[in-house]
Design a protein with these regions (language model features):
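A conserved beta-strand element that flanks and buttresses the S-adenosyl-L-methionine
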Residues: 4-9
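A short His-aromatic
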Residues: 11-16
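Outer-membrane beta-barrel domain signature
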Residues: 19-20, 138
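A short glycine-rich, Lys/Arg-flanked "PGG" loop and its adjoining helix->strand segment in the class I
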Residues: 20-40
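Substrate-binding/catalytic lobe of Class I Rossmann-like enzymes that use SAM or dcSAM, i.e.
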Residues: 48-159
């Protein structure tokens, strides 16, 4: 038994929540995952996380125009929230790979800009070009990271 989550954790907590409220929201997420998994189950998560940046530095453009009601987690919050439910087996930071992914997406968007504008309008296309440029810079300089976390279910968690 296993669970795979790609881009889920960014949508568990809202930007305006306090750190305590965010940890509680992540704890609820991990609690549900724990219940869904059979004993000995595994979970793999891919998520953007804060790197060398504070929550206060998070782009209001991304927070309001691209992913409203979303926020990147901090690794420490995820570790705290999963405590005694999951053992963290591995964490890998692939921010450089995701920088390349965002560059490829932006290149494809530019190459197909006319078709994209016809489909969703110039405002939406411009917004996503700006978003992808923000991401390319953020992943390049390490203000945001893309991590892959492997976790094993703790079958008899202590209260």
């Amino acid at each position: 038994d296993a669970l795979l989550g790609v881009g889920v954790l960014e949508h568990v907590a809202k930007l305006e929540l306090s750190e305590t409220e965010k940890v509680e929201a992540y704890r609820n997420f991990f609690g549900r995952c724990h219940k869904w998994l059979k004993p000995g189950g595994w979970m793999s998560l891919q998520t953007g996380v804060y790197g060398n940046m504070l929550r206060e530095d998070f782009s209001q453009f991304i927070a309001t125009d691209v992913f409203p009601e979303s926020d990147y987690p901090n690794l420490v919050d995820l570790a705290k929230a999963s405590e005694r439910l999951f053992e963290i087996v591995a964490i890998r930071n692939d921010r450089k790979d995701y920088e390349l992914t965002c560059k490829a997406w932006l290149s494809k968007l530019k190459a197909n800009r006319t078709a994209a504008v016809n489909l969703v309008g110039s405002e939406v296309v411009a917004r996503y070009e700006k978003y992808l440029n923000f991401c390319i810079i953020g992943f390049h300089i390490g203000t945001i990271n893309l991590v892959r976390i492997t976790m094993r279910r703790i079958d008899k968690p202590r209260s």
